[in-house]
């Protein structure tokens, strides 16, 4: 609801917001003839454990032009990026973001595009 309200307040009418389990939605949307839209850009911000293999498989199957992956865990980030790179994506930029100063935690925002 907040995303929709923010879009309306800013007169953004070219975005669609979906509230669902990411793995379930991506798997359903990746099916041929699902009737669900294949997005141009996929944003992933999984928990510390990283994305599920099924969700990453679905992202690769949908072949969006770009993927933005936000991660708080370098190990799972490396694992998931390796899979995306093997499936036709190139890492364009990785930007660490210190959201928790004076701790050893850092978020990384990764921009990928299809080769």
Residues of each region from the PLM?
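Rossmann-like S-adenosyl-L-methionine
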Residues: 1-115
């Amino acid at each position: 609801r907040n995303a929709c309200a923010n879009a309306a307040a800013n007169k953004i009418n070219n975005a669609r917001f979906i509230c669902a389990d990411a793995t379930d939605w991506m798997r359903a949307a990746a099916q041929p003839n699902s009737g669900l839209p294949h997005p141009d850009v996929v944003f992933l911000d999984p928990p510390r454990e990283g994305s599920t293999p099924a969700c990453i498989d679905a992202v690769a199957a949908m072949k969006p032009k770009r993927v933005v992956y936000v991660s708080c865990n370098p190990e799972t980030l490396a694992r998931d990026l390796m899979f995306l790179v093997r499936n036709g994506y190139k890492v364009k930029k990785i930007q660490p973001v210190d959201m928790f100063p004076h701790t050893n935690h850092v978020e990384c925002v990764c921009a990928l595009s299809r080769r």
